[in-house]
Amino acid sequence: MNKLSINDVDVRDKRVLIRVDFNVPLKNGQISNNQRIAAALPTIKLALEKGAKSVVLMSHLGRPDGRPIHAASMKPVVAELENLLGKKIMFLEDCVGSKVEAACANPEPGSVILLENLRFHVEKEGKGKDAQGNKAKADDAAVAAFRASLSKLGDVYVNDAFGTAHRAHSSMVGVDLPVKACGLLMKKELDYFAKALENPARPFLAILGGAKVADKIQLIENLMDKVNEMIIGGGMAFTFLKVLNNMDIGGSLFDEGAKIVGRLVDKAKEKGVKLHLPSDFITGDKFADVAKSATASVASGIPEGWMGLDVGTKTNEVFQKVIEGAKTIVWNGPPGVFEFENFSTGSKQMMDSVVRATEAGTITIIGGCDTATCAKNSNATEKVSHVSTGSGTSLELLEGKILPGVAALSQP
């Protein structure tokens, strides 16, 4: 994961083409959350401070499926970016082609240029939909031409879009420039995951939640090669408990991943990984915040018509001690249905424990959309070591997969 960084590249008098992630939520044509734009500012500012002739920004927004759609235009980003950067932005009505190439060929020194949505072209991802809504595939020559046009817009390529680094799309792997570096946001992501996956301080603890074992098989198996302890929570804990303890789980989640639970437990024993499963639960009579609640344990089981929606008091106490003893923590998936206030206690208490561990010097990394939201709800985003900006990307990294967008970058 050690890649060339923009910190180590001479960009003076060069055009810097930066792949950013400006895929921001829009409401009535207005940006409702500017977090992703703000996250790219340090890289943009650094390029300008280092004397770049121009900074050319490219991103996707929404899912226009390879066709220009007004509602998915990057235009609303202009005012927000100007406000945050304190600088005039030149907006181009396309992202490739002769007009775009001409505008980017010799711009005023210090220019910041924002391209139109990359996903307005089917060649960006290689597939999309035609005007009639039918599936469309870009031919190889068109993809090559699209990539060649992008490559003419800069002298140095910088990728700061960690959230799409797991996709082998044209803007991630197809820019043909001699220098391809990671931006500051990408570097921070790679550095933190390297701390966990390449040389972790031990004991190394993985906390895994989520609904289905089947969705997390690769994640569990890969992390078992690396961690000392593993907490299994969320809906998938019930699949483990039914298989291992023959627990009555009522209407709780149970999935086809059940058939490999035995294999996963055997691997944990073989690798000396200590598995921690919940021992008690807060249950609900339906999947809703207003559900009636009760308590249950592994021994008592959960009656029919009820389901486990959070972990119980004893489980919280055990998990807290496990977290306190760890020196590196990777957390992907809350232990309960934190979206429902009545079933959020376990997730809140776990977040509090992780924050305290961080304060005591533990490296704590949060990945996955739900866990990141949980951190935000608890005002803990700045209180842990790192909250990843790319849920799909971080999951693939933790699964041991190679990220195409990272593999395409230059070595230092």
Swiss-Prot record:
Keyword annotations: ATP-binding, Cytoplasm, Glycolysis, Kinase, Magnesium, Metal-binding, Nucleotide-binding, Transferase
Binding positions for ADP per the UniProt entry: 210, 234, 338
PANTHER family recorded: PHOSPHOGLYCERATE KINASE
Subunit structure: Monomer.
Keyword Nucleotide-binding: yes
Residues noted as binding Mg(2+) in the record, renumbered to the chain: 211, 214-215, 370
Protein name (database record): Phosphoglycerate kinase
Cofactor annotation: Mg(2+)
Known catalytic reactions: (2R)-3-phosphoglycerate + ATP = (2R)-3-phospho-glyceroyl phosphate + ADP
InterPro entries: Phosphoglycerate_kinase, Phosphoglycerate_kinase_CS, Phosphoglycerate_kinase_N, Phosphoglycerate_kinase_sf
Residues given in the record as AMP binding sites: 211-212, 216, 235, 308, 339
Pathway(s) it belongs to: Carbohydrate degradation; glycolysis; pyruvate from D-glyceraldehyde 3-phosphate: step 2/5
Known EC number: 2.7.2.3
GO cellular component: cytosol
Protein's organism: Aplysia californica
HAMAP family recorded: Phosphoglyc_kinase
Gene behind this protein: PGK
GO BP of this protein: gluconeogenesis; glycolytic process
Residues at which CDP binds: 210, 215, 234, 333, 338
Function of the protein: Catalyzes one of the two ATP producing reactions in the glycolytic pathway via the reversible conversion of 1,3-diphosphoglycerate to 3-phosphoglycerate. In addition to its role as a glycolytic enzyme, it seems that PGK-1 acts as a polymerase alpha cofactor protein (primer recognition protein). May play a role in sperm motility.
Keyword set includes Transferase: yes
Binding site for (2R)-3-phosphoglycerate: 20-23, 35-36, 59-60, 62-63, 118-119, 166-167
Main localization of the protein described in the UniProt heading: cytoplasm
Binding site for ATP: 211, 216, 235, 308, 339, 370-371
One Pfam family it belongs to: PGK
Disulfide bridges in this chain: none
